[in-house]
């Protein structure tokens, strides 16, 4: 069936037809031990192996009939004329918070001299080292240039970009262009802005249900489409309750078809940074879950009536609640690491709960999470196992690394 909308995602498990990835690039080689925390990394992946792993991930998707798009290509295709190109460069520099006037001018000249659009996009993703710029005479240096003289970057890299799930989220026929938790990652949403404003296929053709100019934060790892009627959102380290309220009002007002939202409130820390690091849907009636969140988890049911949100805390068993809202007889929660506390902690850290479902009961996983994978297989799920020894160093799994653009309806 040919879709009339360029974005069509009404479930987490419908057969995946089209997906957007980002192949890790030079931004990974601009990670430094001294600045890992600033850039939201715990370790430095080996780029060559990370690219091989990512290419194998993309090929595994193609083998299942999925069309693979790349963020870097879509962004490059969105720079359709010189005016848009220069506007993009100026916004990029402005959002990078470059304060020295001479530095700003040198960066602009460097970027304007890159004539190929894809090369330009990849350079903006990689970041700019001060050593790449011409030496600024002391007489032209501003106070900022002098104070930050030991910091090696004129513009920081964006090493988290291969986690394409977070800067924006596809919801039904719409898109949530997110305002992200950290300044480091919020710059990533600029590419989505240009894709959904200027791209020949997507520009101006997709309803916006959240805008990056909002002041409260939300990330795509906390936005899950459970069915054509029900969304799940996480109140997490990276997503505010206030953002969720804004998102939901917009979704309901634009009549995208959703009738209810389940808001999950859970521990606020890096280990559980998004809902999809602890909870993903793998079949009509099955979910992965990290057992450590179950005790403190609170779930709120949100509906929209008479131009207002109606919020009610849900009591009782999570599996029963999910079954009721999905219209199935019973839901099974499959615990990451099984009943072993050590295995659960280790495999959740390595994204054992962060699965990408490409059809009902067909799931992409990291091969390293052997205990969780064995449990999933024992439940009748088909697993597509990928290597992720380098990719996982960024603390994200197959769902984190993918943004569906089109799924078949269930």
Curated annotation (Swiss-Prot):
It comes from the Bacteria. One of its GO terms (biological process) is arginine deiminase pathway. The active site is at residue 400. Pathway: Amino-acid degradation; L-arginine degradation via ADI pathway; carbamoyl phosphate from L-arginine: step 1/2. It is found in: Cytoplasm. GO terms for cellular component: cytoplasm. The keyword Cytoplasm applies. The keyword 4Fe-4S does not apply. Its EC number is 3.5.3.6. Its main location: cytoplasm. SUPFAM superfamilies: Pentein (SSF55909). It catalyses: L-arginine + H2O = L-citrulline + NH4(+). Keywords: Arginine metabolism, Cytoplasm, Hydrolase. GO terms for molecular function: arginine deiminase activity. Belongs to the arginine deiminase family. This is Arginine deiminase. It comes from Streptococcus agalactiae serotype Ia (strain ATCC 27591 / A909 / CDC SS700). The lineage of its organism: Bacteria, Bacillati, Bacillota, Bacilli, Lactobacillales.
């Amino acid at each position: 069936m040919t879709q009339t909308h360029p974005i069509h995602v009404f479930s987490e498990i419908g057969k995946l037809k089209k997906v957007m990835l980002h192949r890790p690039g030079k931004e990974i080689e601009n990670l430094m031990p001294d600045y890992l925390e600033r850039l939201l990394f715990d370790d430095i992946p080996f780029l060559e192996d990370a690219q091989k792993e990512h290419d194998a991930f993309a090929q595994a998707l193609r083998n299942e009939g999925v069309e693979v798009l790349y963020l870097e290509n879509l962004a490059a295709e969105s720079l359709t004329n010189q005016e848009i190109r220069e506007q993009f460069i100026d916004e990029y520099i402005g959002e990078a918070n470059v304060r020295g006037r001479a530095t700003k001018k040198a960066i602009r000249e460097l970027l304007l001299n890159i004539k190929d659009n894809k090369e330009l996009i990849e350079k903006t993703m990689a970041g700019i080292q001060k050593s790449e710029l011409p030496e600024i005479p002391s007489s032209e240096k501003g106070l900022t240039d002098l104070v930050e003289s030991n910091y090696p970057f004129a513009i920081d890299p964006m090493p988290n970009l291969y986690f394409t799930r977070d800067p924006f989220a596809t919801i039904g026929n719409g898109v949530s262009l997110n305002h992200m938790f950290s300044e480091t990652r919020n710059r990533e949403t600029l590419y989505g802005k240009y894709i959904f404003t200027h791209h020949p296929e997507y520009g101006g053709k997709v309803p916006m249900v959240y805008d990056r100019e909002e002041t409260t934060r939300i990330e795509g790892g906390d936005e899950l489409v459970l069915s054509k009627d029900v969304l799940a959102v996480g109140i997490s380290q990276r997503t505010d309750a206030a953002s969720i309220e804004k998102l939901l009002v917009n979704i309901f007002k634009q009549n995208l078809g959703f009738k209810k939202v389940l808001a999950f409130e859970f521990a606020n820390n890096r280990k559980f940074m998004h809902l999809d690091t602890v909870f993903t849907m793998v079949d009509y009636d099955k979910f992965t879950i990290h057992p450590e969140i179950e005790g403190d988890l609170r779930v709120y049911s949100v509906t929209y009536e008479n131009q207002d949100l109606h919020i009610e805390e849900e009591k009782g068993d999570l599996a029963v609640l999910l079954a009721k809202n999905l219209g199935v007889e019973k839901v099974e929660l499959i615990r990451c690491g099984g009943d072993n506390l050590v295995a659960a902690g280790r495999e959740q850290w390595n994204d054992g709960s962060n699965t990408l479902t490409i059809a009902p009961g067909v799931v992409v996983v990291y091969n390293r999470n052997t205990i969780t994978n064995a449990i999933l297989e024992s439940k009748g799920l088909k697993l597509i196992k990928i290597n992720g020894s380098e990719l996982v160093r960024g603390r994200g799994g197959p769902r984190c690394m993918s943004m569906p653009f089109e799924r078949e309806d269930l």
